[in-house]
Amino acid sequence: MTHWEFKGRELVNCTCEYGCNCQFNALPDKGHCHPVAGIHIDEGHHGDTRLDGLKIAAIFKWPGAIHEGNGEAIAFVDERADDAQREALLKIMTGQDTDPFATMFAVYASTVTNMHAPVFTDIDFEVDVEGRRGRLSIADYVEMTGEPIRNKVSGEESRAQIVLPAGFEYAVADIGSASSRSTGPVEVEFRDSYGQFANLHLNSHGVVRS
């Protein structure tokens, strides 16, 4: 198994309300799970292949809860990646070179039965985790925006976090509001729903905890 590790930042938007039951081992509140995710790798490697500064994204659709399977997915890889980097990123994203179920990549890959061909393209993605703002734009495929949750009375920004001491994706996530719309082989659309902003530190064995 080739060892990999990276630090980065993510924005994830799904169909759930702001709390996202899935983070607490409960069933999705809409009965299905349709997420869009973008990740900026600040620094990382897969074996001797550097991954610094590259971006990846994905769209998923599960007809029920994630663990029930039968998912559909499409992966997007930064067109700036060379052949070695593309191969490395796809291995990470599909749960290869990873302990069983140690990362969200490995968990999700095990529940997807219809994986579309990956797309190598320009990924316009930026995210401010602490500020709870971000956007993802992939031409002809997907648009996602994220912002802070607003207090329903005062209109002021509201901040909440989810802490998962034994999670497989992040240690702490800031929660905001996000909206997504996609076209192409995996179509989703939802507004003002669960937005997950997180700093990531992952490797072949799972979340790296200090």
Which residue ranges define each predicted feature?
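Extended, charged low-complexity segments
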Residues: 144, 149-210
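N-terminal ordered "arm"
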Residues: 2-46
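Charged linear interaction tracts used for macromolecular binding and regulation
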Residues: 71, 75-156, 160
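Short acidic, gly/pro-rich beta-turn/loop elements at beta-sheet edges
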Residues: 26, 47-49, 85, 146-148, ...
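Short, surface-exposed loop and linker segments with low hydrophobicity and enrichment for Pro/Ser/Thr
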Residues: 23-32, 64-69, 119-137, 178-182
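Low-complexity, flexible helical/coil segments
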Residues: 48-55, 75, 109-115, 163, ...
